[in-house]
């Protein structure tokens, strides 16, 4: 695709293109809640639909933490077995992993205490895609990070995932863990006004100061994306591709409808 047709230096809607961060209301609120969690320590829960910006918010928040004060550990629950999770956590915290769960439990608590009390660093344990987490790990977490001799939390444990994670934690068996949440935030989609600003900011970031999508095209994209940044990016990208194939300099509503069908969103 020749993006120069649209006055763009590059395609700002591609995932692997130069990142142009658009700070929506939900993004800023998520960062505010995460910053509060970092200060207070304890358990936090961040949920939202697919493509709502959870990973972007968590990644940027974690990257901004002072490495002299925080030790960030990231785990993706969709790719790890229960035993792999515990061994990976021990190793990431600086310990020696074992094949025995009790040994890994002890090592995790020892390493958290060592970082907190000796190194004066707060472990920040990010459990991404935590909607895949099993009841076994959820039951373990409240025990694993319960330091009886110290009433204060020694680590930040962030569960990040889809909305069904909230439903899981509402089960009575998980009430003790839910009561320990010091932060619970669900990311909603963008408003239409934010969606328009999102598109404009992306175009500006790619060196384009004029309109690329006409009003009908913009409205169609906003309706189909339902406020989800990932879907909006995908639709804009596919619409540009369709418009380029038709040698259009301005994307119209018919082209967006073709893009919606191509993306199987219609």
Region locations from a protein language model:
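C-terminal alpha-helical "lid" subdomain
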Residues: 2, 59, 176, 193-197, ...
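Conserved NTP-binding/hydrolysis module of P-loop NTPases
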Residues: 10-13, 70-72, 80-99
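Conserved alpha-helical scaffold flanking the Walker A/P-loop in AAA+ ATPase domains
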Residues: 33-36, 102-118
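Walker A/P-loop nucleotide-binding motif
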Residues: 40-60
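Conserved Walker B catalytic segment
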Residues: 43, 113, 119-159, 172
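Conserved AAA+ ATPase "SRH/arginine-finger" region at the nucleotide-binding site
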Residues: 75-79, 168-169, 182-195
């Amino acid at each position: 695709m020749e993006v120069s047709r649209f006055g763009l230096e590059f395609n700002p809607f591609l995932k692997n293109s130069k990142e142009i961060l658009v700070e929506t209301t939900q993004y800023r609120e998520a960062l505010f809640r995460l910053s509060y969690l970092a200060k207070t320590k304890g358990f936090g829960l961040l949920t939202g639909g697919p493509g709502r910006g959870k990973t972007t918010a968590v990644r940027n928040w974690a990257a901004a933490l002072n490495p002299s004060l925080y030790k960030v550990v990231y785990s993706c629950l969709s790719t790890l077995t229960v035993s792999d999770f515990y061994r990976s956590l021990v190793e990431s915290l600086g310990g020696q992993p074992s094949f025995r769960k009790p040994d890994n439990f002890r090592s995790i608590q020892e390493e958290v205490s060592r970082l907190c009390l000796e190194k004066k660093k707060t472990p920040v344990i990010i459990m991404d895609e935590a909607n895949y987490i099993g009841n076994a790990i959820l039951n373990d977490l409240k025990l694993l990070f319960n330091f009886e001799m110290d009433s204060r939390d020694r680590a930040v444990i962030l569960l990040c995932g889809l909305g069904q994670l909230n439903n899981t934690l509402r089960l009575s068996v998980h009430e003790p863990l839910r009561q320990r949440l010091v932060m619970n935030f669900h990311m909603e989609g963008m408003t239409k006004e934010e969606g328009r600003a999102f598109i404009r900011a992306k175009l500006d970031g790619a060196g384009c100061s004029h309109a690329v999508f006409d009003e009908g095209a913009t409205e169609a994209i906003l309706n189909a994306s339902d406020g989800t940044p990932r879907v909006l990016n995908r639709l804009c990208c596919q619409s540009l591709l369709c418009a380029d194939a038709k040698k259009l300099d301005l994307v119209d509503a018919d082209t967006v409808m073709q893009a919606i069908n191509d993306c199987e969103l219609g």
